[in-house]
Amino acid sequence: MASNKRYFSSSSSMLPWLGIAAVLVLLDQITKITITRLFVYGESHAVTSFFNLVLVYNKGAAFSFLASETGWQRYFFTIMGIGAAIFIIYLLKKHAGQRLFCWALALILGGAIGNVIDRVLYGHVIDFLDVHIGGWHWPAFNIADSAICIGAVLFIYDELRRVGK
């Protein structure tokens, strides 16, 4: 699951990783609060020819998966997010010295907590980053989603690197 290379002297050094996750949560929440104060729901402003800022709500998961359900998904994804956060904290404690693995976990943790906060407070996740090129349009996302995706890529890279040794 994680490479065996250690960069810190003790397994109790998970605090830097929790700090990274906390910074991501703050950045995610500050950007969401800012967008909700500056935009009304559905409002969009072009920043470049391929990037807009927009205010939309997602009651589902990634790519609005299950968004049209009756409301049970709010609780399901909240519980899943909290469970994932607890498991990630356990992994950070166990593998605190494994730098790349812990970067991946810290990014995923920060993103998961950022989106759980939205679900608990609002019943949906606030999305505001909108990328489109030609006829291709990516679903709106946020800082938390970006952190989760980058963390997942780092996790896969770390696993491939470890297996390749």
Swiss-Prot record:
Cellular localization per UniProt: Cell inner membrane
This protein's record includes keyword Lipoprotein: no
Membrane association type: Multi-pass membrane protein
Catalytic activity: Release of signal peptides from bacterial membrane prolipoproteins. Hydrolyzes -Xaa-Yaa-Zaa-|-(S,diacylglyceryl)Cys-, in which Xaa is hydrophobic (preferably Leu), and Yaa (Ala or Ser) and Zaa (Gly or Ala) have small, neutral side chains
Alphabetical UniProt keywords: Aspartyl protease, Cell inner membrane, Cell membrane, Hydrolase, Membrane, Protease, Transmembrane, Transmembrane helix
Pathway in which this enzyme or protein is active: Protein modification; lipoprotein biosynthesis (signal peptide cleavage)
Protein name: Lipoprotein signal peptidase
Originating species: Janthinobacterium sp. (strain Marseille)
Gene: lspA
